[in-house]
């Protein structure tokens, strides 16, 4: 469930950020594209580092750290008055997503019995696919009906649920 929620947040935000950057911050198309893409740069940087730190600190501590940074960086979307701040928040949010998703993958791989590894990894992957199926739809729907601030508050609430579920 944690993986589904983490990826749902990713898909909710990725489809609305370019629109928000253009409409609210008057970004050009390339600036809006950077605001979307810089998230993945943060994710890649985190994944390059996360494996080493998981070996040192352990999966659970890295998951908690990732969720904490994810929570803080998601709440920071409320305070993005310019493109530089939005890009910084996006990078940090992507970094947190990279830590969290790497930790959850490692935890799942370590707890599934070898005899059911294929089945377990399949279900884990299914949670990602389900998030990809509903996240963009919900993001656009919510942006037009409830607004940007509601989506950010909703994502913060989902991260809190992830934190509760990871204990």
Regions found by a protein language model. Give the residues of each.
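Conserved MFS/SLC helix-loop-helix module at the cytosolic interface between two early adjacent transmembrane helices
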Residues: 45-78
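MFS-fold secondary transporters
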Residues: 73-77, 93, 166
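Cytoplasmic helix-loop-helix junction between adjacent transmembrane helices
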Residues: 89-127
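Helix-breaking motifs and short loop linkers at transmembrane-helix boundaries and internal kinks
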Residues: 26, 58, 79-84
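Residue-level signature of mid-helix packing/kink "hotspots" within the transmembrane helices
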Residues: 40-44, 48, 132-133
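Small-residue (Gly/Pro/Ala) motifs that create kinks and tight helix-helix packing interfaces
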Residues: 18, 131-143
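Helix-loop boundary and gating motifs at the non-cytosolic
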Residues: 1-25, 30-32
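C-terminal membrane-cytosol helix-exit motif in multi-pass small-molecule transporters
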Residues: 156-167
């Amino acid at each position: 469930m944690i993986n589904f929620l983490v990826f749902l947040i990713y898909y909710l935000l990725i489809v609305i950020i370019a629109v928000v950057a253009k409409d609210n911050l008057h970004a050009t198309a390339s600036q809006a594209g950077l605001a979307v893409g810089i998230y993945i740069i943060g994710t890649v940087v985190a994944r390059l580092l996360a494996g080493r730190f998981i070996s040192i600190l352990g999966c659970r501590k890295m998951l908690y750290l990732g969720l904490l940074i994810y929570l803080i960086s998601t709440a920071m979307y409320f305070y993005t008055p310019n493109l530089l701040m939005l890009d910084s928040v996006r990078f940090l949010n992507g970094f947190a997503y990279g830590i969290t998703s790497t930790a959850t993958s490692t935890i799942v791989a370590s707890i599934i019995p070898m005899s059911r590894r294929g089945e377990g990894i399949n279900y884990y992957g299914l949670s990602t696919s389900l998030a990809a199926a509903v996240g963009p739809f919900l993001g656009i729907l919510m942006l037009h009906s409830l607004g940007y601030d509601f989506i950010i508050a909703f994502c913060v609430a989902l991260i809190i649920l992830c934190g509760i579920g990871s204990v």
